[in-house]
Curated annotation (Swiss-Prot):
Residues 42-109 are annotated as: Disordered. This is Period circadian protein. Residues 42-56, 68-80 have a biased composition (Polar residues). Essential for biological clock functions. Determines the period length of circadian and ultradian rhythms; an increase in PER dosage leads to shortened circadian rhythms and a decrease leads to lengthened circadian rhythms. Essential for the circadian rhythmicity of locomotor activity, eclosion behavior, and for the rhythmic component of the male courtship song that originates in the thoracic nervous system. The biological cycle depends on the rhythmic formation and nuclear localization of the TIM-PER complex. Light induces the degradation of TIM, which promotes elimination of PER. The gene is per. Phosphorylated with a circadian rhythmicity, probably by the double-time protein (dbt). Phosphorylation could be implicated in the stability of per monomer and in the formation of heterodimer per-tim. Its main location: nucleus. Residues 81-97 have a biased composition (Low complexity).
Length: 109
């Protein structure tokens, strides 16, 4: 016996499969997939004083076994360049790490 507090399914929830079928039957026009790799624009300034602003890779390489730790504490300014995705078809993934997959009816089943 179900609780009377539960919300009954809505019309859209009951007809989810029918809505999907109707969507794919309508042959929707989708944006063409770009064959160019995602254009990446690096936007960061190179610090003049590299003694206190080290890249995360430099901190990682210097931290192992040598006994001398450069200014790599969590409070130091790490030079982490921010990468901006300038492509309007990007999915937020980095360039080439995940292939773009076109949504098809078979993927939803």
């Amino acid at each position: 016996s179900k609780s009377s507090i539960e919300t009954p399914p809505s019309y859209n929830q009951l007809n989810y499969n029918e809505n999907l079928q109707r969507f794919f039957n309508s042959k929707p026009v989708t944006a063409p997939v770009e064959t160019d790799p995602i254009k990446m624009e690096q936007s960061y300034s190179t610090p003049a004083n590299t003694g206190s602003n080290l890249s995360p890779m430099q901190c990682f390489e210097d931290s192992g076994g040598s006994g001398s730790s450069r200014n790599c504490t969590s409070g130091s300014n790490l030079n982490m360049g921010s990468v901006t995705n300038t492509s309007n078809t990007g999915t937020g993934t980095s360039s080439g790490s995940a292939p773009l997959v076109t949504l098809t009816e078979s993927l939803l089943k």
